[in-house]
């Protein structure tokens, strides 16, 4: 085969040629091209007049000498109009029931069927066999059909629990299209003088029959790594738990995996990558409700698990917690010891802060975490002036729990060793301590763990950078994944600076 990167570049240029003169249809063209290159079917949902038929017509030009067939279904459509008329000569002379298929669906590489759900049972049954087995029964003979891409279109979804569901399940890729939205694109579309039916693809980019057949075998050789399978299984398990999730047949999952293999192959890779799984958003939905649900679940998968984002954050949380434990273990050494003032005749003992404590805001660590005001608290932030007044005059004292929110009323006291002790509602106490000196830096154990975590983050980010060069994935999805990885990296760096 050609060098993988050269093949990826060629397919990218082929797609760009097919997209010329079509506005806001790049994603649809690219997925239809991927379907054509892997022998799959596409369903286009949308109102009339939004270039659904033109998309299918364009795909004919992706192949050298490809034949196309298109037909607008009605309730009165007959099999003869789709599969060819009966041969009167064969019936008369030889008594054979045979169709003349030249120029009809059985001899076309690219097929477009508009208003597909209006087709009658006779057409649907034959069409199912054509899609499933790439075969057509013509009289007593079974003939192979060359169909590489079937594009079916409608402005509505099939009725639930109807005889149409079997055909709908065969439409692997499902795209919901709308009118041109962008103002500049709308203007360009109105003023374009390009003949939409002209061939925009140079011969050098068109796919030959030999290449197409060879690629079908090579697509099947693309591997599915264990970690990618685990992501797919995680998605499947999650969908099974959701009451409103669409039913996804085993057949659809299997066909979807081949589409992912094709995406990897035409992106120059030898294995399916997590980024390819984004294509499942156009394969697993059934209706408008499930479309949104599937996109949400895949978004969670991509931004939380595909590059171990959530796993790295969990590890980071454990490291931070361990760091706090180490700090708390040192709290006896760094416990804040207040100074007892003279006051023999005073009714209340008075104290003051040590002279070396000069910050206007003090963050004091709890020797052991306490639950205060329904929050697990590991440190409290005080205003120095408020703490000094309390030490001197008593009364109410407030502090911010874990340094966040509004200052909360606290049960604070000075014990016999002149340490500050905070108590919860059950009067369990925890000594307050000064944080370790910043000059001490991170403990070696914590520093090593953070360095290992940062190294793993860099590996995951590098993997994503290598894999994101995928023609078939929209850029906004790649942007969200990049943002999720950058957020993890920022949290790791912040922990390293503590």
Curated annotation (Swiss-Prot):
<dbReference type="GO" id="GO:0005524">
    <property type="term" value="F:ATP binding"/>
</dbReference>
<keyword id="KW-0067">ATP-binding</keyword>
<dbReference type="InterPro" id="IPR023671">
    <property type="entry name" value="ATPase_RavA"/>
</dbReference>
<dbReference type="Pfam" id="PF17868">
    <property type="entry name" value="AAA_lid_8"/>
</dbReference>
<comment type="function">
    <text>Component of the RavA-ViaA chaperone complex, which may act on the membrane to optimize the function of some of the respiratory chains. RavA functions as an ATPase.</text>
</comment>
<comment type="subunit">
    <text>Homohexamer. Interacts with ViaA.</text>
</comment>
<dbReference type="Pfam" id="PF20265">
    <property type="entry name" value="LARA_dom"/>
</dbReference>
<dbReference type="Pfam" id="PF12592">
    <property type="entry name" value="ATPase_RavA_C"/>
</dbReference>
<keyword id="KW-0143">Chaperone</keyword>
<feature type="binding site">
    <location>
        <position position="54"/>
    </location>
    <ligand>
        <name>ADP</name>
    </ligand>
</feature>
<feature type="binding site">
    <location>
        <position position="53"/>
    </location>
    <ligand>
        <name>ADP</name>
    </ligand>
</feature>
<dbReference type="InterPro" id="IPR045427">
    <property type="entry name" value="MoxR"/>
</dbReference>
<dbReference type="InterPro" id="IPR027417">
    <property type="entry name" value="P-loop_NTPase"/>
</dbReference>
<keyword id="KW-0378">Hydrolase</keyword>
<keyword id="KW-0547">Nucleotide-binding</keyword>
<dbReference type="GO" id="GO:0016887">
    <property type="term" value="F:ATP hydrolysis activity"/>
</dbReference>
<feature type="binding site">
    <location>
        <position position="52"/>
    </location>
    <ligand>
        <name>ADP</name>
    </ligand>
</feature>
<dbReference type="InterPro" id="IPR050513">
    <property type="entry name" value="RavA_ATPases"/>
</dbReference>
<dbReference type="GO" id="GO:0005737">
    <property type="term" value="C:cytoplasm"/>
</dbReference>
<dbReference type="Pfam" id="PF20030">
    <property type="entry name" value="bpMoxR"/>
</dbReference>
<dbReference type="InterPro" id="IPR046898">
    <property type="entry name" value="RavA_LARA_dom"/>
</dbReference>
<feature type="binding site">
    <location>
        <position position="196"/>
    </location>
    <ligand>
        <name>ADP</name>
    </ligand>
</feature>
<feature type="binding site">
    <location>
        <position position="50"/>
    </location>
    <ligand>
        <name>ADP</name>
    </ligand>
</feature>
<dbReference type="InterPro" id="IPR022547">
    <property type="entry name" value="ATPase_RavA_C"/>
</dbReference>
<dbReference type="InterPro" id="IPR041538">
    <property type="entry name" value="RavA-like_AAA_lid"/>
</dbReference>
<keyword id="KW-0963">Cytoplasm</keyword>
<comment type="similarity">
    <text>Belongs to the RavA family.</text>
</comment>
<feature type="binding site">
    <location>
        <position position="51"/>
    </location>
    <ligand>
        <name>ADP</name>
    </ligand>
</feature>
<dbReference type="InterPro" id="IPR003593">
    <property type="entry name" value="AAA+_ATPase"/>
</dbReference>
<feature type="binding site">
    <location>
        <position position="49"/>
    </location>
    <ligand>
        <name>ADP</name>
    </ligand>
</feature>
<dbReference type="InterPro" id="IPR046932">
    <property type="entry name" value="RavA_LARA_sf"/>
</dbReference>
<protein>
    <recommendedName>
        <fullName>Regulatory ATPase RavA</fullName>
        <ecNumber>3.6.1.-</ecNumber>
    </recommendedName>
</protein>
<feature type="binding site">
    <location>
        <position position="23"/>
    </location>
    <ligand>
        <name>ADP</name>
    </ligand>
</feature>
């Amino acid at each position: 085969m050609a060098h993988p990167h050269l093949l990826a570049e060629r397919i990218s240029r082929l797609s760009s040629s097919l997209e010329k003169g079509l506005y806001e249809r790049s994603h649809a063209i690219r997925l239809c091209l991927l379907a054509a290159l892997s022998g799959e079917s596409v369903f286009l949902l949308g109102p009339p007049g939004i270039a659904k038929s033109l998309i299918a017509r364009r795909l004919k030009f992706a192949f050298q000498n490809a034949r196309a067939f298109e037909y607008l279904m009605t309730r009165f459509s007959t099999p003869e109009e789709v599969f060819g008329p009966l041969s009167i000569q064969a019936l008369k002379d030889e008594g054979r029931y045979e169709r003349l298929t030249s120029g009809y669906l059985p001899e076309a590489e690219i097929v477009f069927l508009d208003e597909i759900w209006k087709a009658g049972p006779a057409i649907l049954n034959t069409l199912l066999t054509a899609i499933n087995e790439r075969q057509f029964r013509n009289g007593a003979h079974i003939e192979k059909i060359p169909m590489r891409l079937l594009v079916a279109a409608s402005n509505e979804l099939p009725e639930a629990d109807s005889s149409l569901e079997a055909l709908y399940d065969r439409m692997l890729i499902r795209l919901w299209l709308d009118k041109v939205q962008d103002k500049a694109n709308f203007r360009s579309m109105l003023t374009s003088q390009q003949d939409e039916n002209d061939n925009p693809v140079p011969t050098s980019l068109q796919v030959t029959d030999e290449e197409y057949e060879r690629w079908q075998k090579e697509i099947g050789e693309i591997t599915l790594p264990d970690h990618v399978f685990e992501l797919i299984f995680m998605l499947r398990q999650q969908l099974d738990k959701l009451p409103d999730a669409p039913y996804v047949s085993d057949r659809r999952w299997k066909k979807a995996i081949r589409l992912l293999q094709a995406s990897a192959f035409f992106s120059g890779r030898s294995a399916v990558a997590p980024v390819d799984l984004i294509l499942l958003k156009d394969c697993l939905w059934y209706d408008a409700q499930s479309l949104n649900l599937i996109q949400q679940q895949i978004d969670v998968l991509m931004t939380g698990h595909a590059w171990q984002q959530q796993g790295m954050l969990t590890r980071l949380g454990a490291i931070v917690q361990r760091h706090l434990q180490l700090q708390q273990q040192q709290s006896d050494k760094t416990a804040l010891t207040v100074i007892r003032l003279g006051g023999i005749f005073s009714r209340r003992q008075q104290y003051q802060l040590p002279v070396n404590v000069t910050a206007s805001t003090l963050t004091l660590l709890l020797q052991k975490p306490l639950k205060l005001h329904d929050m697990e608290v590991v440190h409290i932030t005080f205003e120095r002036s408020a703490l000094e007044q309390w030490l001197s005059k008593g009364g109410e004292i407030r502090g911010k729990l874990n340094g966040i929110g509004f200052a909360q009323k606290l049960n604070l006291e000075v014990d016999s060793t002149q340490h500050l002790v905070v108590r919860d509602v059950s009067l369990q106490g925890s000594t307050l301590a000064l944080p370790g000196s910043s000059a001490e830096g991170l403990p070696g154990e914590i520093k090593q763990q953070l360095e290992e975590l940062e190294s793993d983050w860099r590996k995951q980010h590098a993997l994503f950078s290598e894999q994101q060069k995928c023609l078939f994935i929209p850029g906004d999805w790649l942007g969200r994944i990049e943002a999720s990885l950058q957020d993890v990296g920022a949290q790791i760096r912040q922990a390293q600076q503590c």
